[in-house]
């Protein structure tokens, strides 16, 4: 994926959306959040994202069947889900390479950032035995240069609409770019 190309298209499309719908620009300092965007804006931005060389991988956790203590500490649940997805994405094909992972700062608390990094490195490098250098970067989605995080937010929001509201218009749009989907229907622990 050419990150610069995705960055540029998001920057351009969000500016155009803000110019056409100025009320959307006033909600957040440097972004138009997907949850706040009008459906036509969201659809157009998703089309623009998908016009780039991207693949989409995601994980779905059914919270109705997730143990209560995992729901109480969302960082542990997030770290666990992130590790599962990332371990499916980083494979032997990546040996000898550097993999860059960009996380939305709002999804990880300060205290859990190092544990997330260490948790993933322990799994990939030590448990799977892969010779991979992993760089982690955390960026606030409201930062002036967080267009890649914002692109991921638009994709996630579109997929969320499918699972939460049975609205598949956005999922149908992205389905050709889907690489890995991981469903976790039960995080129940041992009883």
Indicate residue ranges for each PLM-predicted region.
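Phosphate-ester processing/binding pockets and catalytic centers
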Residues: 1-191
